[in-house]
Amino acid sequence: MKRSIFAPNLIKNAHFYKIEMKKVVYFLLALVVVGLGACDNGPKFKVQGEVTGAADKMLYFEASGLEGIVVLDSVELGSDGCFGFVGARPESPDFYRLRLDGKVVNFSVDSTETVTLKAEADKFDTDYVIEGSASNQKIKELVLLHGELQKKVDKLSQNRGIPAGIAQQTLSNLINEYKNKVRKEYIFSAPNTTYAYFALFQTLNGYMIFDPMANKDDIKCFAAVATSLNNTYPHADR
């Protein structure tokens, strides 16, 4: 069989093609690396701090989005309990949280601030110190107020000696007392803040405390916050 006069050229062209393809691949990889570097150089916020008594435990950094909780990063804490996370600056104020052994600390971020948290592992979600934003101190106050309400409701439900009618009235009084305080001190006083928004969506045993579908006064709370935040952040998703 005669050897084709085109064979050497085909082999030569194939070799040339492989070389060129390698160049293209390297070029594309370089573009990806540069692109990732460019994304990584965008505005950031930091979350850092220390959790004592939490050696070898996992600490999770999560986003509290409209579609649910998303884990952004995690770290296994060392003996010193120090940690640090970095996140891309949100386009508008958004909510995040740190989770340790099922205990959660909620906080908000609206710029490139540094949020610093110090806590003990066994009191992670109740006795923590958070710095870097006045809103986050208010969110902590709301969490503690809610915790006190939950304790009172739990105690009431465990008292089997109270007639059902009295128990129901007592429950309503507890909830209304809580709502009046939050409405006055956290919602209407500063409706354009993240903590006012946070207050609206707290729940009690699975039910919304402020329920715009069942209470006309609650509608006013939602309207005040929605109007204020929309004026301040017209392009926000929330």
Predicted features along the sequence, with ranges:
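Bacterial Sec-dependent N-terminal signal peptides
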Residues: M1-E50
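A non-transmembrane, solvent-exposed segment enriched in polar/low-complexity residues
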Residues: C39-E185
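Inter-repeat boundary and helix-capping residues of tandem alpha-helical solenoids
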Residues: N176, F188-S189, T193, D218
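Amphipathic alpha-helical repeat scaffolds
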Residues: K184-F188, F201
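Amphipathic alpha-helical repeat scaffolds of TPR domains
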Residues: N192-Y207
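Short coil/turn connectors between adjacent alpha-helices in alpha-solenoid helical repeat scaffolds
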Residues: M208-D218
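N-proximal helix/coil linker or "cap" segments that precede and/or mark the start of modular domains
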Residues: I219-R238
